[in-house]
């Protein structure tokens, strides 16, 4: 089973700040996907196949990486971006998720 380790577990960013969340895999993976979850809702697909934005995701989000190291970046933090972000990989037949990164607004 491939283990995904996210960093940081919790972070706070000021509005307009650049934010980067990393996801490290215990073995090389071909693709990494990201989900956004807000309080009281199910996780939504956010970035798929490393860098492709899901429908409706703002262009300030981007994804990158290869092998065992991947990241999600927000170029300029907005209030609506406060959420929990999860990385996810599918290594047939197992799907594994990271433990999540909680992104808060720094006030």
From Swiss-Prot:
<keyword id="KW-1280">Immunoglobulin</keyword>
<feature type="region of interest" description="Framework-4">
    <location>
        <begin position="97"/>
        <end position="106"/>
    </location>
</feature>
<keyword id="KW-0391">Immunity</keyword>
<feature type="region of interest" description="Complementarity-determining-2">
    <location>
        <begin position="49"/>
        <end position="55"/>
    </location>
</feature>
<dbReference type="InterPro" id="IPR013783">
    <property type="entry name" value="Ig-like_fold"/>
</dbReference>
<dbReference type="InterPro" id="IPR036179">
    <property type="entry name" value="Ig-like_dom_sf"/>
</dbReference>
<feature type="region of interest" description="Complementarity-determining-3">
    <location>
        <begin position="88"/>
        <end position="96"/>
    </location>
</feature>
<dbReference type="Pfam" id="PF07686">
    <property type="entry name" value="V-set"/>
</dbReference>
<feature type="region of interest" description="Complementarity-determining-1">
    <location>
        <begin position="24"/>
        <end position="33"/>
    </location>
</feature>
<dbReference type="InterPro" id="IPR007110">
    <property type="entry name" value="Ig-like_dom"/>
</dbReference>
<feature type="disulfide bond">
    <location>
        <begin position="23"/>
        <end position="87"/>
    </location>
</feature>
<dbReference type="GO" id="GO:0002250">
    <property type="term" value="P:adaptive immune response"/>
</dbReference>
<dbReference type="InterPro" id="IPR003599">
    <property type="entry name" value="Ig_sub"/>
</dbReference>
<dbReference type="InterPro" id="IPR050150">
    <property type="entry name" value="IgV_Light_Chain"/>
</dbReference>
<feature type="region of interest" description="Framework-1">
    <location>
        <begin position="1"/>
        <end position="23"/>
    </location>
</feature>
<keyword id="KW-1015">Disulfide bond</keyword>
<dbReference type="GO" id="GO:0006955">
    <property type="term" value="P:immune response"/>
</dbReference>
<dbReference type="InterPro" id="IPR013106">
    <property type="entry name" value="Ig_V-set"/>
</dbReference>
<protein>
    <recommendedName>
        <fullName>Ig kappa chain V-VI region XRPC 24</fullName>
    </recommendedName>
</protein>
<feature type="region of interest" description="Framework-3">
    <location>
        <begin position="56"/>
        <end position="87"/>
    </location>
</feature>
<keyword id="KW-1064">Adaptive immunity</keyword>
<dbReference type="GO" id="GO:0019814">
    <property type="term" value="C:immunoglobulin complex"/>
</dbReference>
<feature type="region of interest" description="Framework-2">
    <location>
        <begin position="34"/>
        <end position="48"/>
    </location>
</feature>
């Amino acid at each position: 089973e491939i283990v995904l380790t996210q960093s940081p577990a919790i972070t706070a960013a000021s509005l307009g700040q650049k934010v980067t969340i990393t996801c490290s895999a215990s073995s090389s993976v071909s693709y990494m996907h990201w989900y956004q979850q807000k309080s009281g809702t199910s996780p939504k697909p956010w970035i798929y196949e490393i860098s492709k934005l899901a429908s409706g995701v703002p262009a300030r989000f981007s994804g990158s990486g290869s092998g065992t190291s991947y990241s999600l970046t927000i170029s300029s933090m907005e209030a609506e971006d406060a959420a929990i972000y999860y990385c996810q990989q599918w290594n047939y037949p197992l799907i594994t998720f990271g433990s999540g990164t909680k992104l808060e607004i720094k006030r």
